[in-house]
């Protein structure tokens, strides 16, 4: 019933018979200063003049204006990866919120994507620093109210489990990142 409601809502927002996506579930990847960025774009539309529109579907409701900018990070990330991989900045980023039928559209520019790139590089530098030092400081926010791991979080008096000895290598070495840890003997 819920899936049917979401499909019906999608049909009220877009006429699928008129859509001719260039790509669906498109794997995107680019390297930025040695950092490999990758993800999956729900839908990529390309117009006759080559302009790209990146579309992402969300089953939930659109965020309030207070959180809208952070919800666009994923879309700016996709735009950055496409720009670096294809040499063209997408003209339009579009979030489709099927939960309440809202469309959020954003037109990125080079300055915006360069700022996104700087932010990603700074985040990765912080991850590298934490992996090398073992200093993973929690950041308390309202999202903690929904977290299932508060009992393990130092910010809430919890004790995290010890990291495997090879955790920094597994996190930072691209040749092993994302692979399962070897089984204990």
Language-model features, listed with the residues they occupy:
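A non-catalytic, helix-rich entry segment at domain boundaries
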Residues: 1-24, 31
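Short linear motifs at secondary-structure transitions and domain/linker junctions
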Residues: 1-2, 17-21, 68-72, 119-124, ...
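Short, surface-exposed helix-loop/turn micro-motifs enriched in polar/charged residues
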Residues: 16-20, 66-70, 87, 135-139
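Metal-dependent nuclease catalytic regions and adjoining charged, substrate-binding loops involved
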Residues: 82-185
């Amino acid at each position: 019933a819920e899936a049917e409601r979401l499909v019906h809502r999608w049909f009220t927002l877009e006429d699928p018979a008129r859509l001719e996506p260039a790509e669906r579930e498109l794997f995107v990847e680019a390297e930025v200063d040695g950092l490999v960025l990758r993800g999956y774009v729900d839908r990529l539309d390309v117009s006759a003049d080559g302009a790209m529109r990146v579309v992402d579907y969300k089953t939930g409701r659109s965020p309030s204006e207070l959180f809208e900018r952070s919800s666009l990070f994923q879309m700016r990330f996709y735009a950055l990866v496409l720009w670096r991989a294809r040499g063209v900045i997408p003209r339009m980023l579009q979030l489709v919120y099927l939960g309440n039928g809202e469309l959020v559209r954003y037109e990125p520019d080079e300055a915006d994507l360069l700022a996104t790139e700087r932010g990603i590089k700074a985040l990765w530098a912080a991850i590298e620093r934490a992996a090398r030092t073992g200093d993973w400081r929690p950041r308390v926010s309202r999202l903690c109210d929904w977290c299932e791991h508060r009992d393990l979080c130092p910010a809430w008096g919890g004790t995290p489990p010890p990291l495997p000895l090879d955790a920094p290598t597994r996190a930072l070495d691209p040749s092993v990142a994302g692979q399962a840890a070897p089984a204990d003997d």
